[in-house]
Amino acid sequence: MFLVDWFYGVLASLGLWQKDAKILFLGLDNAGKTTLLHMLKDERLVQHQPTQYPTSEELSIGNIKFKAFDLGGHQIARRVWRDYYAKVDAVVYLVDANDRERFPEAKKELDGLLSDESLTNVPFLILGNKIDIPYAASEDELRYHLGLTGVTTGKGNINLAGTNVRPIEVFMCSIVRKMGYGEGFKWMSQYIK
């Protein structure tokens, strides 16, 4: 029973209580997608091999249905991302904030996602991960390199009803330290219908 109560608390704190959501976890390889999925599932931190094949986790307790797809981030895996866009409710795009050399590649992939017509109105939560590592990029630096300066929606409860504005925001996090991503999911949940 403790596990059920704990899991309810996690989803409620992330704003996903009583919502059905199909969420894609995307980003380059080694950004932390699988680690985040396992932290959300059972707060387990383990070393992962690179994701070779798409995986999904469907978590259900009471009225909660949360289906997350971890599609891998290496170049071959990115070719199948498009196959999962149908009926997606949100995209969580992870970026390794400590790997500045790959910011241009991360921007290119993000630009491709943002310009895809099948994702036009889908909320995007951008997580700059690994801020626990010294000299990781700041939020402003990451926004700049991803071309998101002045483009994001704004944090907090922003009402976008009746507009054609896509919800998109950057949150910095450390999955291994369990910090930052909760605020991002709370923000994203307000835009999941």
Swiss-Prot record:
Its main location: endoplasmic reticulum. Pfam families: Arf. Keywords: Endoplasmic reticulum, ER-Golgi transport, Golgi apparatus, GTP-binding, Nucleotide-binding, Protein transport, Transport. GO terms for molecular function: GTP binding; GTPase activity. GTP binds at residues 27-34, 70-73, 129-132. One of its GO terms (cellular component) is COPII vesicle coat. It is found in: Endoplasmic reticulum; Golgi apparatus. One of its GO terms (biological process) is intracellular protein transport. PROSITE patterns: SAR1. It comes from the Eukaryota. Belongs to the small GTPase superfamily. SAR1 family. NCBIfam families: small_GTP. Involved in transport from the endoplasmic reticulum to the Golgi apparatus. This is GTP-binding protein SAR2. It comes from Solanum lycopersicum.
